[in-house]
From Swiss-Prot:
<dbReference type="GO" id="GO:0005886">
    <property type="term" value="C:plasma membrane"/>
</dbReference>
<dbReference type="InterPro" id="IPR032807">
    <property type="entry name" value="GNVR"/>
</dbReference>
<keyword id="KW-0067">ATP-binding</keyword>
<protein>
    <recommendedName>
        <fullName>Putative tyrosine-protein kinase in cps region</fullName>
        <ecNumber>2.7.10.-</ecNumber>
    </recommendedName>
</protein>
<dbReference type="Pfam" id="PF13807">
    <property type="entry name" value="GNVR"/>
</dbReference>
<dbReference type="Pfam" id="PF02706">
    <property type="entry name" value="Wzz"/>
</dbReference>
<dbReference type="InterPro" id="IPR003856">
    <property type="entry name" value="LPS_length_determ_N_term"/>
</dbReference>
<keyword id="KW-1003">Cell membrane</keyword>
<keyword id="KW-0808">Transferase</keyword>
<keyword id="KW-0472">Membrane</keyword>
<keyword id="KW-0597">Phosphoprotein</keyword>
<dbReference type="Pfam" id="PF23607">
    <property type="entry name" value="WZC_N"/>
</dbReference>
<keyword id="KW-0997">Cell inner membrane</keyword>
<comment type="similarity">
    <text>Belongs to the etk/wzc family.</text>
</comment>
<dbReference type="GO" id="GO:0005524">
    <property type="term" value="F:ATP binding"/>
</dbReference>
<dbReference type="InterPro" id="IPR025669">
    <property type="entry name" value="AAA_dom"/>
</dbReference>
<dbReference type="InterPro" id="IPR005702">
    <property type="entry name" value="Wzc-like_C"/>
</dbReference>
Amino acid sequence: MTSISKKKQPETVDDLDFGRMVGELIDHRKIIIALTSFATLIALLYAFFATPIYKADALIQVEQKQANAILSNLSQMLPDSQPQSAPEIALIQSRMILGKTVDDLNLQAVVSPKYFPIFGRGWARLSGEHQGNIQLSRLYVSSSIGDEENPPEFTLKVKDSNRYVIEFGGEEINGKVGELIEKDGITLKIDEINAKPGAEFTIKYVSKLKAIADLQENLSVADQGKDTGILILSYLGDDPLKIKNIVDSISENYLAQNISRQAAQDEKSLEFLNKQLPMVRSDLDSAEDKLNDFRKRNDSVDLSLEAKSVLDQIVNVDNQLNELTFRESEISQLYTKEHPTYKALMEKRKTLQDERGKLNKRVATMPETQQEILRLSRDVESGRAVYMQLLNRQQELNIAKSSAIGNVRIIDSAVTQHKPVKPKKIIVVLAGLFIGLVISVSLVLVRILLRKGIETPEQLEELGINVYASIPVSESNPKNVIAKRLNKRDDSRPKVLLATENPADLAIEAIRGLRTSLHFAMLEARNNLLMISGASPNAGKTFVSSNLSSVISQTGKKVIFIDADLRKGYTHKLFNIKNTNGLSDYLSGRVALDKIINNLQTEGFDYISRGSVPPNPAELLMHNRLAELLEWANKSYDIVILDTPPILAVADAAIIGNYVGTTLLVARFEENTPKEIDISVKRFQNSGVNIKGCILNGVVKKATNKYGYGYNYYDYSYSDKK
């Protein structure tokens, strides 16, 4: 009759409840603490050794654009005259502005002190050992030396405050402060040395485009508030004085560009007027001559009151049309015909032209003499008005040109903040702590998900297997203690029998509990033969069987322990007995039965060793001598315990199992999987052997059991010491 009853399928590894997860994290706390501490330490080192980054900023105001003399009234036609910041921001970040800054500050020359790699610069800053600096006013490297991807780089060594040496391409070039060096494609001038003799500096010459790109990367321009017309320029860098000079240079170059552009607009308008004035004056003189000639021929005919009124209106319309013509010539240089400003001007011109057409129709109804004198008078008046208007505009433009200030002004010059903006030490350390915690917890969770070993008796019971005992890891062996703390198992074989060496050990206490359970479990067995096997090597079946034999013998029962592992049995070492004559020797017929029985020190405890390793263990076990031996032992002893090889490795246990009345399977905690135990049970059943139950060996006390399942086995010890 089998003791195995099929129950529900075991939980999968993915079925992790919150309590078990908390327990696992507590069990792996040392790994979590170690990784988190390591990540925090790295963050601390970075926070203190990383180069501080400072920020310099300046404020610039972009005012509403001043209309020049010709466009003085144009703002009335615009729906919104607020400054547009996006074009100004793009202009500040353009190569035109930044390129001028690169030239002004010689930013193509990158000079940096030489430090020990990685930590050298930070250590020098923390210890106050600064390398000093050098002032370089001119540097040029021929394009034949290096390229944009690999800019030329050379080393400058300070000899004293007035002399230095350049090392480049295996050659040395000696130089003095204030002297220009021109040699081998290198042009260099050092103005000042503020460094100790022996100090080294790296000098790199980058292309202008690369220098501009570096400026664009570290420069930010943004509005300070919506529709304020205030721009804030910010620049990041590790040299407080240098970044201040860079921001000041960018601001000044932007201001100068704005002023020059305004002056250029006035210059173009003035050039246009200078061309128009002579032609307008000539037309005016011609119109006056024609009017005088007409009056002489017609005896000084004067205009009627109606004609004078029409003339005044026509002259007024013509003046407005002429002014629009000037405006159009200026606007055409700034906007396309599709721009709203240009369209508004054209609509106003059409309105004036329509009005002039109506006035011309009124003139057509007058007498011919009045029409002619009206036409000539209109030409004179319109020409005179245009000429005077142009003269006024010319004077205004001359004044505007000489006093152009643009629509930009610098409100606050550049200032570098005293405290660095990067790295934020507290944030860096907290980030390191968080990242270390996330990584360590993730590794633990991945390890848990990948682990498929048995952790609780419930997993075996879900397979329908009775669990007779859960044996904890012995703490008597220091290796076991270390392995327990590291959540590992100890693969080394025991050298002594724990039941005699330390009978108070928790593992032996668990085996005593197993002894009690077996007393009742074997009452219905067909004989008193007990076979103990394992699913796989290192399950601990030898440890369990040998110590179980010892604790049963201590009750006064007559016990014989047989090492039936003919391949790797080692129990003779536990009992300190020579392995000359053993089970294999008896089964092969080389020795008699009485020669293989060893009487141990404990009364009533006999032992049969493995014997010599045979070439055919399975065949020997199928010999009739094994049946005869077991029948004799069954009659001669109260209990016979056999230690057999693991069933998944060899078939020896299946052969022996047909002779015994009780079979127990040993499973290793977190080592054997439920699937391995299930396969082992089926393999025994296929051979006609029924498994009475299972022993869970090597159990480690874990927080997982406390928080996840609520079981803690052998958490207490019992002693008579006070």
